[in-house]
């Protein structure tokens, strides 16, 4: 659908800074933009800053878990707050749920957000609606909610199918369960399913990497994002590794 996909908020922020003058704040630029009727294609991004299990390599801030139970209401309030701006009245070509892990919300919370999304905005018939998830959150109930809400793309954070690697990286469930979750998502009708894979983590061998790639080939996924492990200070995996191990990464 698009020629380029920004992989992180860092990339998106860099592009945003090119859009407004140095004398103008980001807030005033966004306010001005929302009050204009432009012909460019529209994308909505919804952020869910929660995870049911924190990856051992994750350096990001964790918000108060007590906020999670009401977070869908916050998203719905925000949608209603901006949907009447002239800029948002045009058809929406794509919707991206990122995080965090958006499917860390309860199925009924996700259902409420997806339902209200179509109430607030004119979602184009061919719009890509993409949700990030981990393997363990893709239960039959969650998949049913996503399909009902029009989700047609999934990005699943697998990282590795190797059981020892999954334990080291703080992923829940076995590699076999992760592969089953990917298959189930595709079989549910979300053919545009992609996964994230991490390489160059401690203990990974060429044989383990080749085994991961063999599983991937068998799944029939639509895309693969392949990243090296980036070691951040103050993360569990950083403290677990010795100085010599850290120096090799």
Name each model feature, range by range.
Residues 31, 35-38, 55, 97, ...:
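General secondary-structure edge motif
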Residues 3-8, 56-60, 116, 186:
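A broad, low-specificity signal for short, low-complexity segments enriched in glycine/proline
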Residues 40-73:
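Canonical Radical SAM [4Fe-4S] cluster-binding loop centered on the CxxxCxxC motif
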Residues 1-44, 53, 88:
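Flexible, acidic/Gly-rich N-terminal and inter-domain linker regions that tether
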């Amino acid at each position: 659908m698009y020629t380029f996909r920004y992989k992180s908020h860092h990339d998106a922020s860099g592009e945003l800074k090119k859009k407004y003058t140095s004398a103008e704040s980001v807030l005033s630029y966004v306010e001005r933009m929302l009050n204009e009727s432009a012909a460019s294609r529209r994308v909505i991004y919804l952020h869910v800053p929660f995870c049911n299990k924190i990856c051992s390599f994750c350096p990001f801030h964790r918000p108060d878990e007590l906020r999670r139970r009401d977070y869908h209401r916050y998203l719905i309030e925000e949608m209603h707050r901006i949907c009447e701006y002239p800029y948002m009245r045009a058809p929406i070509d794509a919707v991206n749920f990122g995080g965090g892990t958006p499917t860390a919300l309860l199925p009924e919370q996700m259902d409420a957000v997806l339902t209200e999304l179509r109430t607030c905005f004119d979602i184009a018939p061919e719009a890509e609606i993409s949700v990030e998830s981990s393997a363990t959150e893709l239960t039959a109930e969650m998949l049913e909610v996503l399909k009902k809400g029009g989700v047609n793309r999934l990005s699943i954070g697998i990282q590795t199918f190797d059981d020892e690697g999954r334990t080291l990286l703080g992923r829940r469930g076995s590699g076999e369960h992760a592969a089953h979750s990917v298959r189930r998502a595709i079989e549910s009708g979300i053919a545009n399913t992609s996964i994230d894979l991490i390489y160059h983590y401690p203990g990974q061998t060429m044989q383990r990497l080749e085994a991961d790639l063999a599983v991937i080939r068998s799944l029939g996924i639509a895309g693969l994002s392949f990243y090296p492990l980036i070691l951040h200070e103050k993360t569990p995996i950083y403290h677990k590794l010795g100085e010599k191990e850290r120096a090799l990464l």
